[in-house]
Amino acid sequence: MEQEQDTPWTQSTEHINIQKRGNGQRTQRLEHPNSIRLMDHYLRIMSRVGMHKQIVYWKQWLSLKNPTQGSLKTRVLKRWKLFSKQEWIS
């Protein structure tokens, strides 16, 4: 049975569980508990960045002084409020 050599990279990025079998032989199980957490964190940050870009875009659009946009402006504001509430809930 071959055993994998641990490099500094695998030691730093993988969590190593060492279990003892009934016959006294030790086995190593490599897992990535932090990779899932990191991906989740990355996605959360990226969604916030996307949200910020949308807010900046809508604020720029809404700041335009065009009388034909009066009714659109209120409609968009209502939709934006609903959308942002749903985003923060989920």
UniProtKB/Swiss-Prot annotation:
One of its GO terms (biological process) is symbiont-mediated suppression of host cytoplasmic pattern recognition receptor signaling pathway via inhibition of MAVS activity. It is found in: Host mitochondrion inner membrane; Host nucleus; Host cytoplasm, Host cytosol. It holds the Pfam family PB1-F2. It comes from the Viruses. Keywords: Apoptosis, Host cytoplasm, Host membrane, Host mitochondrion, Host mitochondrion inner membrane, Host nucleus, Host-virus interaction, Inhibition of host innate immune response by virus, Inhibition of host MAVS by virus, Inhibition of host RLR pathway by virus, Membrane, Modulation of host cell apoptosis by virus, Viral immunoevasion. InterPro entries: Flu_proapoptotic_PB1-F2. Residues 1-31 are annotated as: Disordered. The keyword Membrane applies. Its main location: host cell. Residues 1-27 have a biased composition (Polar residues). The record marks 66 as: Low pathogenicity. Residues 65-87 are annotated as: Mitochondrial targeting sequence. One of its GO terms (cellular component) is host cell nucleus. Oligomer. Interacts with human SLC25A6/ANT3 and VDAC1. Interacts with host MAVS. Plays an important role in promoting lung pathology in both primary viral infection and secondary bacterial infection. Promotes alteration of mitochondrial morphology, dissipation of mitochondrial membrane potential, and cell death. Alternatively, inhibits the production of interferon in the infected cell at the level of host mitochondrial antiviral signaling MAVS. Its level of expression differs greatly depending on which cell type is infected, in a manner that is independent of the levels of expression of other viral proteins. Monocytic cells are more affected than epithelial cells. Is not encoded in all strains, and seems to be dispensable for replication. Belongs to the influenza viruses PB1-F2 family. This is Protein PB1-F2. The gene is PB1.
